[in-house]
């Protein structure tokens, strides 16, 4: 209900519709992220951790192939898959880069209207789909991921225009990577304001008590 162009169904990855870019299969929660970013045609948009490209194709569609979308993936193998997906999708306004966020920030100081940081995370939300992920999880892993995510977010802030929009998302439930990272952002970048997100069925408020008690965290999803 929260993604006008999203439909439930079974998609064969080898089907003609998928191979030619008419459809792209992804989780409803992943599609929701693109709706929150809500890029507009003609804007400058950065997808900082973009591979394999599902959310990126959504951003391309919402921008109607107008403006500039920089899709970055630090790992070359992932960047190749990202480029293939964007080509299949018919993206004309996208540029694929394979840089660290720290290097990319030097090229685009305060340049983008909107930035999506779909951060690499501990992946707790994927355990139901990929049980093998449990094998590399440990009690220390969420904090390790959170430290890495903060470095990525710091770079993102250096590339965001004044008055721009930053969307931070993960596929984990760990407070260290979610509420606590948002609280870290608000503390270290006092000009940021946490904008309320309209919630749909199955979504819950952020939990201030899982971070520093900042009441604004209820605006997160």
What positions do the PLM features span?
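S-adenosylmethionine
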Residues: 1-221
């Amino acid at each position: 209900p929260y993604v006008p162009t999203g439909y439930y169904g079974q998609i064969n990855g080898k089907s003609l519709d998928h191979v030619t870019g008419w459809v792209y299969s992804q989780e409803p929660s992943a599609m929701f992220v693109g709706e929150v970013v809500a890029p507009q045609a003609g804007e400058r948009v950065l997808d900082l951790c973009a591979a394999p490209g599902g959310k990126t194709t959504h951003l391309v569609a919402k921008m109607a192939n107008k403006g500039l979308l920089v899709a970055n993936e630090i790992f070359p193998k992932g960047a190749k898959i990202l480029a293939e997906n964007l080509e299949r999708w018919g993206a004309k306004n996208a540029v694929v880069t394979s840089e660290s966020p720290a290097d990319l920030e030097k090229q685009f100081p305060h340049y983008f209207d909107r930035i999506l940081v779909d951060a690499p995370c501990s992946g707790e939300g994927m355990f139901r789909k990929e049980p093998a992920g449990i094998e590399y999880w440990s009690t220390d892993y969420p904090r390790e991921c959170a430290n890495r995510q903060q470095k990525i977010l710091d770079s993102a802030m250096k590339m965001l225009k004044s008055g721009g929009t930053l969307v931070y998302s993960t596929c984990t439930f760990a407070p260290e990577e979610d509420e606590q990272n948002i609280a870290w952002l608000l503390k270290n970048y006092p000009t940021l304001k946490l904008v309320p997100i309209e919630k749909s069925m199955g979504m819950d408020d952020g939990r201030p008590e899982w971070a520093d008690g900042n009441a604004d965290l209820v605006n997160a999803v």
